UniProtKB/Swiss-Prot annotation:
GO terms for molecular function: ATP binding; catalytic activity, acting on a protein; magnesium ion binding; phenylalanine-tRNA ligase activity; transferase activity; tRNA binding. This is Phenylalanine--tRNA ligase alpha subunit. Binds 2 magnesium ions per tetramer. The gene is pheS. It is found in: Cytoplasm.
Length: 352
């Protein structure tokens, strides 16, 4: 029997064995039998040493062609077996369409989103306009347009994330107020709130975060008085914390308002008697406010002899912490589903 006859017979037998394989395990045995390290095709290569040098290239080529042919048939058979196995599984599996489906888990609003929307709805009802602004802001609008020139010592009050010498992540939403007044070309009235994220170089802990949410409000018109500000803040406190709440104003300092005040609300937990929430003072600080500084009005193009206004700023993070008894601001930003799921129950009870 010649070498060609031997290869042809080996090929024919390999094709028969491949065709008769009933599963992937049997097919693997066939592969080892012919193409394995000690397989029949590998054995043919050992015969090459007995051939004359001029016959070795042609012989080696034929052996490789045989190997490739067998490998191709193995691959096709393996694909066929996989398809047959899949079809069998599909035929055996049945789905009872009458069974109830799995309950879909429906999410709920994030507590900060809920708080921001509650505050927005309150001010929309008072005729305010909601205005958005840039989170990446110019130094001028973040500071100088708000009566904070480069030499002003109050700039040390806020460590900022600067991108360039003139561009930074805004440290408050007040730049939106400055830009809005500038666009009005000195014509009132202006009645807006500006919700959004702000950024400061604070070390994250239970009460501080490098990123947090702020809502600021601004009213500019003729004959706006401190009493208008006080009445607005009283309404906000009662809507957010309960109808029996009272507020008190404490003198403070902000470069963009004069006079400036810190606003406290009577403690909703102890009713002013003193507890751990109010640190036994009976009062809880909720926001800062004041009458718009004449310099801010003038830089925005308003005549400070004709127009006056008030501004206030609050942190929805702090308000949400107070309302829901949350002790760590970091819970808002860590995406812990166990924490967030609790507010689904609040929503279901209609307390949203």
């Amino acid at each position: 029997m010649t070498q060609n006859d031997s290869m042809a017979e080996l090929k024919q037998q390999a094709l028969v064995d491949i065709n008769e394989a009933q599963n992937e395990r049997e097919l693997q045995d066939v592969k080892v039998k012919y193409l394995g390290k000690k397989g029949s095709v590998s054995g043919l290569m050992k015969n090459m040493k007995d051939l004359p040098n001029e016959e070795k290239p042609a012989y080696g080529q034929k052996v490789n062609e045989l190997r490739q042919t067998i490998q191709k048939e193995l691959d096709e058979k393996q694909e066929l077996l996989k398809n047959e196995k899949l079809n069998q599984q599909l035929a055996e599996e049945t789905i009872d369409v009458t069974l109830p489906s799995r309950q879909i888990s429906i999410g709920s609003k994030h507590p900060l989103t809920r708080t921001v929307e509650e505050i927005e709805d309150l001010f929309l009802g008072l005729g305010y306009e909601i205005v958005d602004g840039y989170e990446v802001e110019q130094d001028y609008y973040n500071f100088e347009a708000l009566n904070l020139p480069k030499s002003h010592p109050a700039r040390d009050m806020q460590d900022s994330f600067y991108i360039t010498d003139e561009i930074l992540m805004r440290t408050h939403t007040s730049p939106v107020q400055a830009r809005t007044m500038e666009k009005r070309n000195g014509q009132g009235p202006v009645k807006i709130i500006c919700p959004g994220k702000v950024y400061r170089r604070d070390s994250d802990d239970a009460t501080h975060s490098h990123q947090f949410t702020q809502i600021e409000g601004l009213v500019v018109d003729k004959n706006i008085k401190m009493s208008d500000l006080k009445g607005t803040l009283e309404l906000v406190a009662k809507k957010l914390f309960g109808a029996d709440r009272e507020i008190r104003l404490r003198p403070s300092y902000f470069p963009f308002t004069e006079p400036s005040v810190e606003v406290d609300v009577s403690c909703f937990k102890c009713k002013g008697k003193g507890c751990n929430v109010c640190k036994h003072t009976g009062w809880i600080e909720i926001l800062g406010a004041g009458m718009v500084h004449p310099n801010v009005l003038e830089m925005a193009g308003f005549d400070s002899n004709e127009y006056s206004g008030f501004a206030f700023g609050m942190g929805p993070d702090r308000i949400a912490m107070l309302k829901y008894g949350i002790e760590d601001i970091r819970y808002f930003y860590t995406n812990d589903v166990r924490f967030l799921e609790q507010f689904k129950a609040v929503e279901d009870r209609g307390e949203a």
